[in-house]
Amino acid sequence: METPILYYWAPCSTCSVTVNFANDHGIELDKRDVEQEGPYTELLALGGDANLIPYLAVGGELIQGNDAVIEYLTKTYL
């Protein structure tokens, strides 16, 4: 199974909810901070909006927001 990519901003308290959930449940994520140009450009190319982070990219799909990301992680990994 491919490692999901989490587009987030490290200081963002909203993003920390998803990061902490994954950490607490031992779910490996490829975390990419959109404050850096590379991840920011990747997210835009996928159709995401850095103002609406976090996003989870998995299987060609882009999942937006804590609730949707946590729901996906729960169904897939727990």
Q: How does the language model describe each region?
A:
Residues 69:
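A basic- and aromatic-enriched beta-loop-alpha substructure that forms the phosphate/nucleotide-
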Residues 45-52:
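Thiol/disulfide oxidoreductase modules built on the thioredoxin-like
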Residues 28-40:
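Thiol-based oxidoreductase modules, predominantly thioredoxin-like and allied folds used
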Residues 54-62:
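A short, hydrophobic beta-strand/beta-hairpin element that forms part of a small beta-sheet core
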Residues 1-29:
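Local sequence-structure signature of Cys/Sec-based thiol-disulfide redox active-site neighborhoods
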